[in-house]
Design a protein with these regions (language model features):
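Conserved helicase NTPase motor core
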Residues: 11-22, 26-30, 41-42, 54, ...
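Short glycine-/polar-rich loops that comprise or flank the Walker A/P-loop
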Residues: 26, 55-59, 86-88, 126, ...
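Residues at the beta-strand->loop junction immediately N-terminal to the Walker
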Residues: 31-33, 63, 337, 394
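Helicase P-loop NTPase motor core
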Residues: 34, 39-42, 46, 57, ...
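Conserved SF1/SF2 helicase motif Ia
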Residues: 49-65, 82, 253-254, 360-361
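Conserved P-loop NTPase-based nucleic-acid remodeling module centered on helicase motor cores
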Residues: 59-152, 165-173, 280, 336, ...
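Basic/charged alpha-beta structural segments of nucleotide/phosphate-handling enzymes
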Residues: 126-127, 131-194, 198, 212, ...
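Conserved helicase C-terminal RecA-like lobe
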Residues: 171, 224, 363, 377-389, ...
């Protein structure tokens, strides 16, 4: 039965794909061109480990770059190895896996200023603290915009720089300002017992590097490491993989069974610290690396591949590969250079009408129009409306980005961590309790005087001497609500608590 399953896993794969699936020991670099079946290869490789090599599923780690990719990988593996075996594997994004590690190793976070109940702040929460830091430093928000400060701080973290290191390496004055904001921002994070997404990576790397025994536990657990979209790894992510697979410079205890799948030609996250050099340096950092090139494209015709190859060949830092396809030459690529965006929109609408009239397409849903920025949709939409072409713009706010969901999560986070000032400020007047900015400012001042969190200051608000009667009553009502909810945590189910 085992041999039958093994044969099934290799059926339908081309020769390079088979090599990628069956090369299971030691470091492996799979260079996968677009449309070359890399997702199928990585899932079949994991299944091959379980079914043919008889590796326990819980020893397998698979890292993806999006939650969607993680879900799809798990669904595929459920079909290949079974639901129970798939559940035993660790599959997720770098951030999700690091968050899990930090929860397990929470006792080790105390020296870093965090308790077990730490919360994770999203980009909106980060922006709130960035603004607080800027105002606390009396910096002009119009000149040094919070969004710019946030991006510079995130980039510094992706380069594994602390505030002092960022200040030392600053080339422009705006970077010096950002380093000052960074220092206060980190202090505010810790006072809220919170971490941001970048901290998840940095803190995990720091714990593993400083505690060899902790690192060794994870090396023994995850003996087979897989990384998808490897070209998009930033420095902390790369270091995490090297620690797991190789170890520290003075302790090489990793088994080296690291399989990375990527394509330096497809790197899209350079703004987030990703570097194509990761692909180039992998062979240096992991001795005796085996390289497999997936060069057969199953998605496009040769004309499209040749055009793409002509463009990407100009990149100097890349692994050389030549994609080919069995789908034939295909139609030539048509290029239209418009004078402006209005002309571009007019041409696009006219071309859709032409394709429909000629019968090249059966229905409008066969057409997709892609653009680089949201601002470009205006000219297209105007032309579609004028020419009576029905259309649908894809893309709306994600579930967890909706205001009502973020508000509900803020309530839950505050209940779990009363030191979370950011969450308290978000929901103190949601729904409307007639607690305005002036009252909130009074509460913040009261908390500073008490040298405590906003939640603790709220519990003592009755002792405030200058606060108006209506404002004090509104704050006391909110305080009582939170106390009641905290008291009900142990007794109620989550759904009942939300009701």
């Amino acid at each position: 039965m085992m041999m039958l399953e093994q044969v099934n896993l290799l059926n339908g794969l081309n020769e390079p794909q088979r090599k990628a699936v069956t090369t299971t020991q030691g470091p492996v670099l799979i260079l996968a061109g677009p449309g070359s079946g890399k997702t199928r290869v990585i899932t079949h490789r994991i299944a091959y480990l379980v079914q043919h090599e008889e590796i326990s599923p819980w020893r397998i780690l698979a890292v993806t770059f999006t939650n969607k990719a993680a879900r799809e990988m798990r669904e595929r593996l459920e079909k290949l190895v079974g639901v129970n075996e798939s559940k035993e594997m660790t599959i997720g994004t770098f951030h999700a896996i690091c968050a899990r590690v930090l929860r397990v190793e929470a006792d080790s976070l105390a020296p870093l200023g965090l308790s077990k109940s730490f919360v994770m702040f999203d980009t909106d929460d980060e922006a709130t603290l960035i603004k607080q830091a800027i105002r606390g430093l009396n910096i002009d928000e119009k000149q040094y915009r919070p969004g710019v400060m946030q991006a510079l701080i995130s980039r510094a973290k992706n380069d594994m720089l602390g505030p002092e290191q960022m200040a030392e390496q600053a080339v422009k004055y705006v970077e010096e300002v950002a380093a000052r904001v960074y220092k206060v921002y980190q202090r505010l994070l810790r006072s809220n017992n919170a971490v941001d997404f970048d901290d998840l990576l940095m803190l995990t790397e720091r714990l593993w590097r400083r505690d060899p025994e902790m690192l060794h536990r994870y090396q023994r657990k995850w003996q087979y490491v897989h990384v998808d979209e490897f070209q998009d790894c930033n420095l902390p992510q790369y270091k995490l993989i090297r620690l797991l697979g190789y170890g520290t410079d003075d302790r090489h205890e990793g088994l080296g069974n690291v399989c990375v799948v990527g394509d330096d030609d497809q790197m899209i996250y350079s703004w987030r610290g990703a570097s194509s050099e990761n692909v180039l340096r992998f062979e240096e950092d992991f001795p005796r690396t085996k390289v497999v090139i997936l060069d057969q494209n199953y998605r496009s015709t040769q004309n499209i591949l040749d055009a793409a190859q002509h463009v990407v060949r100009r990149n100097r830092q890349r692994k050389d590969k030549q994609l080919w396809t069995a789908l034939g030459t295909g139609e030539k690529i048509f290029f239209y250079e418009a004078f402006n965006e209005e002309q571009e929109g007019e041409f696009t609408a006219r071309e859709i009408q032409r394709l429909l009239a000629r019968g090249d397409i059966e229905k409008l849903s066969d057409v997709a129009v892609m653009y680089r920025t949201n601002a470009q949709s205006r000219a297209l939409e105007e032309q579609f409306l004028r020419q009576n072409i029905p259309y649908k713009v894809i893309g709306s706010r994600k579930f967890y980005e909706r205001k009502e969901i973020k508000d509900m999560l803020a309530y839950l986070r505050l209940l779990a961590n009363p030191n979370d000032d950011v969450s308290l400020l978000r929901i103190i007047n949601v729904p409307n309790r007639k607690i305005g900015p002036k009252t909130v400012g009074e509460l913040q001042q009261w908390a500073r005087q008490q040298n405590t969190s906003l939640y603790n200051a709220l519990q003592r608000i009755s002792a405030h001497q200058t606060l108006g009667k209506a404002a004090k009553m509104a704050l006391e009502t909110f305080s009582q609500l939170m106390q009641d909810l905290r008291g009900a945590i142990e007794e109620l189910q989550l759904t009942e608590l939300l009701d």
